[in-house]
From Swiss-Prot:
<dbReference type="Pfam" id="PF00122">
    <property type="entry name" value="E1-E2_ATPase"/>
</dbReference>
<dbReference type="GO" id="GO:0098629">
    <property type="term" value="P:trans-Golgi network membrane organization"/>
</dbReference>
<dbReference type="GO" id="GO:0005783">
    <property type="term" value="C:endoplasmic reticulum"/>
</dbReference>
<dbReference type="GO" id="GO:0005524">
    <property type="term" value="F:ATP binding"/>
</dbReference>
<keyword id="KW-0333">Golgi apparatus</keyword>
<dbReference type="GO" id="GO:0016020">
    <property type="term" value="C:membrane"/>
</dbReference>
<feature type="transmembrane region" description="Helical; Name=3">
    <location>
        <begin position="263"/>
        <end position="282"/>
    </location>
</feature>
<dbReference type="GO" id="GO:0005509">
    <property type="term" value="F:calcium ion binding"/>
</dbReference>
<dbReference type="GO" id="GO:0140613">
    <property type="term" value="F:P-type manganese transporter activity"/>
</dbReference>
<dbReference type="InterPro" id="IPR023214">
    <property type="entry name" value="HAD_sf"/>
</dbReference>
<dbReference type="GO" id="GO:0016339">
    <property type="term" value="P:calcium-dependent cell-cell adhesion via plasma membrane cell adhesion molecules"/>
</dbReference>
<keyword id="KW-0812">Transmembrane</keyword>
<dbReference type="InterPro" id="IPR004014">
    <property type="entry name" value="ATPase_P-typ_cation-transptr_N"/>
</dbReference>
<comment type="function">
    <text>ATP-driven pump that supplies the Golgi apparatus with Ca(2+) and Mn(2+) ions, both essential cofactors for processing and trafficking of newly synthesized proteins in the secretory pathway. Within a catalytic cycle, acquires Ca(2+) or Mn(2+) ions on the cytoplasmic side of the membrane and delivers them to the lumenal side. The transfer of ions across the membrane is coupled to ATP hydrolysis and is associated with a transient phosphorylation that shifts the pump conformation from inward-facing to outward-facing state.</text>
</comment>
<feature type="binding site">
    <location>
        <position position="644"/>
    </location>
    <ligand>
        <name>Mg(2+)</name>
    </ligand>
</feature>
<dbReference type="GO" id="GO:0000139">
    <property type="term" value="C:Golgi membrane"/>
</dbReference>
<feature type="topological domain" description="Lumenal">
    <location>
        <begin position="720"/>
        <end position="729"/>
    </location>
</feature>
């Protein structure tokens, strides 16, 4: 086995040694020796020059995915379509029968059809590739003595990486610091129980397999508990995960329910189309028509009538919609979620950072002896003052206040550097408070001996320390957390410099003050200190404000009005939670609030009975989210659930739409989620729901257009054959219609701008088919108008009973113009084209103009006239056709107008009856 290797990279006059170290060897060596081999500075990290030199040799910390098959092969594969092969056979037969004009025409048409299909498929693949790049993994590493937030792909061997709960390990690391560290290695070893990690060297005899290397954190594994630091020993394919990656190239993504239904619809239409086409061939042959001509037309009709492009365009529309959502700060990781967004009727949202800004500022202090202090200033900086009875407090001037500040500063993992917070906002607020009093240096005065990390279950954090200058004295514990939890560990309280026994009367005083601060919308933290966790002295309370995000109240109002119920989940007290919810318009007189303890006391059945009326879940933890989701889903709700912590991952997977926070969310949480809010803003959820509804509407518009064209083409040829008319369209003309049907005009319907009124529509029932009765009726009406209009033109031109190029040109152009007007009316199912704006969808305008220009070339350009067997038409002919074909759009607009009028009448009757009942 390879142990270590070195490569010289020229660097001017000097040469840099680039090492590679295996995880087995690194686990056996002391940390100091590993650092020496890697030429790494564990505390200060590498400098930029060293990083660039090492990357020159090792490359980026990512995997090389084998190149896809070349484009020419993908293009050739399009010819494997059975219908295309039949057309090619038709062209070959034409050559053998010396019908060279037909052979050339069919070949040109085949090339155009194949090219359009290839471009569609390539575009679909590229759109999906873009989706996979939306969430690049990130990490924290130390470089040049500073902690940096960087992309995981930037790491090189020798980098120092910091890990915390919820992180995905970005490379193979030899750990040199570990506090209560537990890592889930199931993705690598298959072992579901998290592995405890240490820093001591492992004897060679005991580290044969990966699971036994307890001082190595492997790339791709997940930190479940604790925190650590490690030095990078392997990146990319030189990591242990690199070997696994070679065996687990990504499988093809499963299709979305909508794609599956479109596949099924396509197969059903194909079945019916082949049946009808078979009858057309048989009847044509019995009527004595040319068998080769009938065969070519039938195959061309199959190409046009069978909507093979339906699933591809659906995929492209979904993918392009997802890319539009990115601009609105929402990253959708899985295409099915785009469909689900339009069905969402319940949003369960965390309060902190989603409904509120997550910009914590301490505004009030209450000491254990009843002293009140007001705090000024905002942000993570030293600008502001602590004021007691009108006097500014600084340093240790007021011991009761300074002891609270000391506890909050020492029992803290946050760092504020250059007014930038690195850590949790709540802890940042406590550091900023210490900075205002000039006590932020207290963090460095203590040496930690033990740590009890915060968890959403226990709702407190504690550290055991000794003073740096008094290490011979007993250790002291500092604790901060929810008042109800911290007070359990307290036996005494401070009053005017004295330590007194904590009585029930004193507890009641603190409880009342906590309730008063909470009802003002403040997040309340309790602080304590003492020799042991069970013998702490209560120091007091701090009130932290977290203002609501701008625009959230308006978003909440809009969503509730559209039929989406919103429920707030928070770890705060009832008073704080209800105060914030009321301010946001979430909580009304008829609303209920339920605590985490009450959720524990109920089963899913009991909770499902009251959950529709509950607007606030307070003192709730991630484990309660699972029960809330199940109770809502039991009632038939489609639930979106937000989360940011490791323990939220299970709930996010169980929800119909799991929503992770982009800024505060852990890697585990982001991986479990279906959607990531880049800015952690609740408004972004509303924008995503709006976009989801809009995308679904666009797909309905596209389906309406394509199916009406398919049905019209089939019906036209069928009726002409059964009525013993000459064929109104030849094979090349039918294939041209197919290009329009599957090409740019159709695809441009998928990118129609979202109608702003769509957010006010109620959520869609997820059981509803995309082909509603109303949509089927509109498809049939459009098809009938197109068929009748085209047959009328054909009959009108055929009155001399002799079919000429002019006859087919008029019929062909009539069908194409009908198609363009049909596409125009399909842009919206409810609004007039003038309401949405003729030019609001530029891509549609370009597509229609391009199709019309193409049609004019087919009519007037001699080489194409020969291919499509057309002849020039007069201006009067074109004006006549434009007037006739506009009828499909006019009728569609009349239907929309009637539907809107009927809807207004129903609303008026409904409001009148409700007013009557109230009276």
């Amino acid at each position: 086995m390879k142990v270590a290797r070195f490569q010289k990279i020229p660097n001017g006059e000097n040469e840099t040694m680039i090492p590679v170290l295996t995880s087995k060897k690194a686990s056996e060596l002391p940390v100091s020796e590993v650092a020496s081999i890697l030429q790494a500075d564990l505390q200060n990290g590498l400098n930029k020059c060293e990083v660039s030199h090492r990357r020159a040799f090792h490359g980026w910390n990512e995997f090389d995915i084998s190149e896809d098959e070349p484009l020419w092969k993908k293009y050739i594969s399009q010819f494997k379509n059975p219908l295309i092969m039949l057309l090619l056979a038709s062209a070959v037969i034409s050559v053998l029968m010396h019908q060279f004009d037909d052979a050339v025409s069919i070949t040109v048409a085949i090339l155009i059809v194949v090219t359009v299909a290839f471009v569609q498929e390539y575009r679909s693949e590229k759109s999906l590739e873009e989706l996979s790049k939306l969430v690049p993994p990130e990490c924290h590493c130390v470089r040049e003595g500073k902690l940096e937030h960087t992309l995981a792909r930037d790491l090189v061997p020798g980098d120092t990486v910091c890990l915390s709960v919820g992180d995905r390990v970005p490379a193979d690391l030899r750990l040199f610091e570990a506090v209560d560290l537990s890592i889930d290695e199931s993705s690598l070893t298959g072992e579901t129980t998290p592995c405890s990690k240490v820093t001591a060297p492992q004897p060679a005899a005991t580290n044969g397999d990966l699971a036994s290397r307890s001082n190595i954190a492997f790339m791709g594994t997940l930190v479940r508990c604790g925190k650590a630091k490690g030095v990078v020993i392997g990146t990319g394919e030189n990591s242990e995960f690199g070997e696994v990656f070679k065996m687990m190239q990504a499988e093809e993504a499963p299709k979305t329910p909508l794609q599956k239904s479109m596949d099924l619809l396509g197969k059903q239409l194909s079945f019916y189309s082949f049946g009808i086409i078979g009858i057309i061939m048989l009847v044509g042959w019995l009527l004595g028509k040319d068998i080769l001509e009938m065969f070519t037309i039938s195959v061309s009709l199959a190409v046009a009538a069978i909507p093979e492009g339906l699933p591809i365009v659906v995929t492209v529309t979904l993918a392009l919609g997802v890319m539009r959502m990115v601009k609105k700060r929402a990253i959708v990781k899985k295409l099915p979620i785009v469909e689900t967004l339009g069905c969402c009727n319940v949003i369960c949202s965390d309060k902190t950072g989603t409904l509120t800004k997550n910009e914590m500022t301490v505004t009030h202090i209450f000491t254990s002896d009843g002293l009140h202090a007001e705090v000024t200033g905002v942000g993570y900086n030293q600008f502001g003052e602590v004021i007691v009875d009108g006097d500014v407090v600084h340093g240790f001037y007021n011991p009761a206040v300074s002891r609270i500040v000391e506890a909050g500063c020492v029992c803290n993992d946050a760092v504020i550097r250059n007014n930038t917070l690195m850590g949790k906002p709540t802890e940042g607020a406590l550091i900023a408070l210490a900075m205002k009093m000039g006590l932020d240096g207290l963090q460095q005065d203590y040496i930690r001996k033990a740590e009890y990390p915060f968890s959403s279950e226990q709702k407190w954090m504690a550290v055991k320390c000794v003073h740096r200058t008094q290490q011979d004295r007993p250790e002291i514990c500092f604790m901060k957390g929810a008042y109800e939890q911290v007070i359990k560990y307290c036996t005494t309280y401070q009053s005017k410099g004295q330590t007194l026994t904590l009585t029930q009367q004193q507890r009641d005083v603190y409880q009342q003050e906590k309730a008063r601060m909470g009802s003002a919308g403040l997040r309340v933290l309790a602080l304590a200190s003492g020799p042991e966790l069970g013998q702490l002295t209560f120091l007091g309370l701090v009130g932290i404000i977290d203002p609501p995000r701008t625009g959230v109240k308006e978003a909440v109002t809009t969503l509730i009005a559209s039929g989406v119920s919103i429920k707030m989940i928070t770890g705060d007290s009832q008073e704080t939670a209800v105060a914030i919810a009321s301010r946001l318009g979430l909580y009304s007189k008829t609303s209920q609030s339920v605590s985490g303890e009450e959720i524990d006391a109920m089963d899913v059945q009991q909770l499902s009975q009251i959950v529709p009326k509950v607007a606030v879940f307070y003192r709730a933890s991630p484990r309660h989210k699972m029960k809330i989701i199940k109770s809502l889903q039991k009632n038939g709700s489609v639930v979106a659930m937000t989360g940011d912590g490791v323990n939220d991952a299970v709930a996010l997977k169980a929800a119909d739409i799991g929503v992770a926070m982009g800024q505060t969310g852990t890697d585990v949480c982001k991986e479990a989620a279906d959607m990531i809010l880049v800015d952690d803003d609740f408004q972004t959820i509303m924008s995503a729901i709006e976009e989801g509804k809009g995308i679904y509407n666009n797909i309905k518009n596209f389906v309406r257009f394509q199916l009406s064209t398919s049905i019209a083409a089939l019906t036209l040829i069928s009726l002409a054959t059964l009525m013993n008319f000459p064929n109104p369209l030849n094979a090349m003309q039918i294939l041209w219609i197919n290009i329009i049907m599957d090409g740019p005009p159709a695809q441009s319907l998928g990118v129609e701008p979202v109608d702003k009124d769509v957010i006010r529509k109620p959520p869609r029932n997820w059981k509803d088919s995309i082909l509603t009765k109303n949509l089927i009726l509109k498809i049939l009406v459009s098809s009938i108008i197109i068929v009748c209009g085209t047959l009328f033109v054909f009959w009108r031109e055929l009155r001399d009973n002799v079919i000429t190029p002019r006859d087919t040109t008029m019929t062909f152009t009539c069908f194409v113009f009908f198609d363009m007007f049909n596409a125009l009316s399909s842009r919206s199912q409810t609004k007039s084209v003038f309401e949405i704006g003729l030019c609001s969808n530029r891509m549609f305008c370009y597509a229609v103009l391009g199709s019309i220009m193409g049609q004019l070339l087919v009519i007037y350009f001699p080489p194409l006239q020969k291919v499509f067997q057309t002849e020039s038409l007069s201006i009067l002919d074109l004006l006549f056709l434009l007037g006739l074909t506009s009828s499909v759009c006019i009728v569609a607009e009349i239907i929309k107008k009637v539907e809107r009028s009927r809807e207004k009448i129903q609303k008026h009757v409904s409001s009148t009856s409700s007013s009557f009942l109230e009276v």
